[in-house]
Design a protein with these regions (language model features):
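Extracellular/periplasmic carbohydrate-active domains that bind, remodel
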Residues: 1-464
């Protein structure tokens, strides 16, 4: 098979984006359908590809990143890759659904955010309509595509989320590594928005500034602007497994539904916190933010969910602020500086939710409470069950609300069984930002990646 290399002189354009686009266009015209981007860029004589604008991908196209380093060009404000029909009228129809797009990394393939262009979410609030939206800062951005595969790529200090999907189906995301240090707001890893279905997300490593993997189906904003006629708002049938990562103050796995969109048929198997940073929570279902409180959620908005095999030292192991049905969470172990094992927010309601096999071995003196359930006298709890819980040491077992737990073993209680008051936990989020709200922050980082720069990691404790 004839191989097409983007570095060939016949494809050279005014910049690296045009060069790669020329190679992609030729691969489409000839039916070869594959472009290799090598490490060395013959046009510039450097082992670097600077992309000032997005490369638009047609259907039946494979991009091989052969150990190359792709970077957002200075002052650019565009994606690196997106599908050709995105943001077109055709792309909002079933007839315009693209298919069979692959981006495969070989060797040490990197995608780099480069020098930030200074456009943040706050910038849009301060200057509405002046700049393109934040979705244009995302390196890999796709809408209305089926049969996709992205794997074998490392992401370094992306300007916003690293990957984003709307209305895509039958997608494999595998062997992706993130090194986002929380320098900027919303440095998520993978974001699935409305209309995503039949995804497998696996073997994800590294650390992110915000959520590592987020399923946020919100029926407004870009999800509304990209709405595909004939597809629903719902995100469903998603499998997430073997996530070995941490977040700077946010969730390792995050679920959120708003505006009438739903999420269902979800499986998560294997979350391991790497302690590179302080994750706010290993698992966040819903939110406690009043901004998302209207309209009230239904039990069927978040349903048919299985989450198992979670090992974490995050501030809160599990956080639930959602109305949900038919949910199973099992085999959760906490260690290190974990402060709350399970946090139920005031808006938590459920029908058939079970949490079982919870082991709390947090660093001595760190675990404030095993269960913290906000007060809500009108809360609907039907078939709510917690069982098989072992706690090595905690200040309190219950905070704010007590409820039945089957087979609960607590080896050491430092202060009391129950306390009827809220506390404010310190937050790691935002303390790591080099820039936030469009401004440079000075001396904002703690001396290490824990809450106050003094807590020791499990490895440090084991070495003593």
């Amino acid at each position: 098979m004839t191989k097409i290399y983007a570095s060939e002189q016949r494809f050279w354009g005014e910049n690296d984006s045009q060069t790669i686009q020329n190679a992609v266009n030729y691969a489409e015209e000839t039916g070869l359908g594959e472009v290799i981007i090598p490490r060395f860029n013959d046009r510039t004589g450097k082992a670097l590809w600077d992309l000032p604008e997005a490369v638009l991908l047609p259907s039946d196209m494979t991009i091989i990143l052969d150990g190359c380093h792709l970077r957002h060009a200075d002052d650019s404000h565009d994606n690196l890759f997106r599908n050709r029909n995105m943001w077109t009228d055709l792309g909002k129809t079933m007839e315009g659904e693209q298919h069979d797009i692959r981006i495969i990394g070989h060797g040490n393939a990197w995608i780099d955010g480069g020098k930030h262009n200074g456009v943040f979410e706050q910038t849009h609030r301060d200057h509405p309509g002046k700049y393109r939206g934040m979705i244009w800062q995302i390196p890999l951005n796709f809408s209305n595509v089926r049969n996709m595969e992205i794997r074998g790529i490392k992401f370094f200090e992306t300007r916003y989320w690293a990957l984003c999907f709307h209305y895509c189906r039958w997608v494999l995301l595998s062997d992706l590594h993130f090194e986002n240090s929380g320098l900027y707001e919303n440095q998520d890893g993978i974001d699935l928005r409305c209309g995503c279905e039949y995804f497998t997300i696996q073997n994800i490593t590294g650390w992110t500034g915000d959520d590592v993997v987020a399923l946020t189906a919100m029926a407004w904003g870009n999800s509304a602007a990209l709405k595909v006629e004939g597809k629903t708002w719902d995100t469903h049938d998603i499998t997430i497994k073997n996530i070995i990562a941490s977040s700077h103050g946010c969730g390792i796995i995050r679920f959120l539904v708003e505006g009438g969109a739903r999420e269902y048929n979800l499986t998560v198997d294997g979350i391991k916190d790497i302690t590179q940073s302080v994750s706010g929570t290993a698992l966040l279902i819903g939110t406690s933010d009043n901004h998302f409180a209207d309209p009230p959620h239904q039990m069927t908005d978040f349903k048919n969910v299985v989450i198992r095999n979670v090992t974490t030292c995050s501030q809160r192991a599990i956080s639930i602020g959602e109305t949900c049905r038919d949910v199973l969470i099992e085999n959760v172990t906490t260690y290190g500086p974990n402060q709350v094992a399970v946090r139920f927010y005031d808006n938590f309601e459920c029908e058939n939710l079970t949490i079982r096999n919870l082991t709390c071995r947090s660093q001595k003196g760190c675990l404030d409470s095993v269960f913290w359930m906000g007060k809500n006298p009108e809360r609907r709890l039907k078939h709510f069950k917690v069982e098989n819980v072992l706690v090595a040491s905690t200040d309190y077992v219950f905070r704010c609300t007590e409820f039945p737990v089957d087979n609960l073993i607590v080896e050491e209680i430092n202060k009391g069984w129950f306390i009827d008051e809220k506390i404010k936990l310190p937050s790691a989020y935002g303390r790591y930002h080099y820039m936030a709200y469009g401004k440079i922050l000075d001396d904002c980082r703690p001396k290490d990646n824990r809450y106050d720069g003094t807590l020791k990691t499990p490895a440090e404790l084991a070495a003593e």
